Amino acid sequence: MTKVKIITDSTARLTPEEVAQYDISVVPLTVMIDGTVYHDGVSITPSEFIEKMAASKNLPTTSQPSLGAFTEVYETVPEDVEVLSLHLTHHLSGTVQAAEQAARLVPHDIVVCDSNYIDRALAAQVLVAGRMAQAGATRDEILAE
């Protein structure tokens, strides 16, 4: 049986419990507030983001994860494990394109999927994939769902 690793980005807003339950890896987007750079969900929490945004002189900006951030996560996956990398819609970010570029840089079997959603709608897809992977489904079976 081939194991499947699920990877997503921080816009899915997964809880620490969800990440742990399904062994999901999360690649953080970058947030800049008043010149300070934060890694979403790593160096700034959603509640801290709201507080800082309210006190900010300018609206925050975000940036897709770097190729290095993706390759760093992809390289932690054993080569005999298939990867399904699910991300926020390409209509809002270049995250899918960055994930695709990074996937070509590592010797792993990676399929990058544009969820066409963001936030908890993305999370719903990621959690279904995580449950199916945990139950032993193949990547093709997960994608067919």
Positions of PLM-derived features:
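Short, well-ordered coil/turn elements that cap or connect secondary structure elements
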Residues: M1, Q21, P78, L105-P107
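Generic beta-sheet signal
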Residues: V4, V81-S85
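N-terminal glycine-rich anion-binding loop in soluble enzyme alpha/beta folds
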Residues: K5-A69
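Glycine-rich phosphate/diphosphate-binding loops that line cofactor/substrate pockets in enzymes
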Residues: E72-V81
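Active-site histidine-anchored catalytic micro-motif
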Residues: L84, L92-A144
